[in-house]
């Protein structure tokens, strides 16, 4: 429950901050009449992401068992890639997003005829990317946790993100965003490592990967996944009481380089600024 909550809170907060920055800039530049276009972009993006998530979730239930395992592995790999990209993209461009977002708004509203649609498209792409990141992660999370806790956590995370975003816009809440994104990003890397290990397990169950399947260690008597702590760690980090050599290897092959790159001093380059502009206004 906590992992879907945190991911949706973080992703929802990113989307809420984007909308908040757009609204503040439009208000500050006396262009508040364009807020309708902003909300059109937000709603269309949200509906599209929700529809994609529901469609994928419903159609995969009809697959035979091995195909379901294969799909779970693919979704886990996609989720790992998206989460990793999300962490390192935010690390690079968090200080320059506002500048480039305002530039993208000016470009959209100075585009002549169809400027309203240009603003709708800009907001749509900015919000839809955050939404699609969430969709693929939640699909992976829901496959690992089939209980009601994961959907409830995701909904609560999104609601909290919206409330915090509104509070930030109205000036009632001051959140140290740099620290927030830094520590949630670190947490997400451990989550992604667990998903990577889960992907190799799914590929084995689908019959695609049969190497290094010896049990690396067995902690059943020490920390079983049926215990409260074991269940918590399984849902949060993909913990397994008796993982195979391949699962442990994939976990650390992903996690160690990711942590090294994460703690390296970030580069402040024009390339980061260009990346930010492309994500906001492709």
Swiss-Prot record:
Q: Which GO terms describe its biological process?
A: iron ion transmembrane transport
Keywords (A to Z) from UniProt: Cell inner membrane, Cell membrane, Ion transport, Iron, Iron transport, Membrane, Transmembrane, Transmembrane helix, Transport
MF annotations from Gene Ontology: ferrous iron transmembrane transporter activity
Q: Which residues lie on this side of the membrane: Periplasmic?
A: 1, 57-69, 140-147, 201-244
Residue spans crossing the bilayer: 2-22, 36-56, 70-90, 119-139, 148-168, 180-200, 245-265
Pfam families xrefs? FTR1
Membrane topology qualifier = Multi-pass membrane protein
Record keyword Transmembrane present: yes
Enumerate the Cytoplasmic topological stretches. Answer: 23-35, 91-118, 169-179, 266-282
Task: Kindly list the GO CC terms recorded for this protein.
Answer: high-affinity iron permease complex; plasma membrane
Q: Which domain of life is it from?
A: Bacteria
Tell me where it resides: Cell inner membrane
Q: Tell me, in a sentence or two, what this protein's role is.
A: Uptake of Fe(2+) ions across the membrane.
- Would you identify the family this protein belongs to, as annotated? Belongs to the oxidase-dependent Fe transporter (OFeT) (TC 9.A.10.1) family.
Assembly and partners are described as:
Part of a ferrous iron transporter composed of EfeU, EfeO and EfeB.
Query: What is the designated name of this protein?
Result: Ferrous iron permease EfeU
Q: Which organism is it from?
A: Yersinia pestis
Top-level taxonomy: Bacteria, Pseudomonadati, Pseudomonadota, Gammaproteobacteria, Enterobacterales
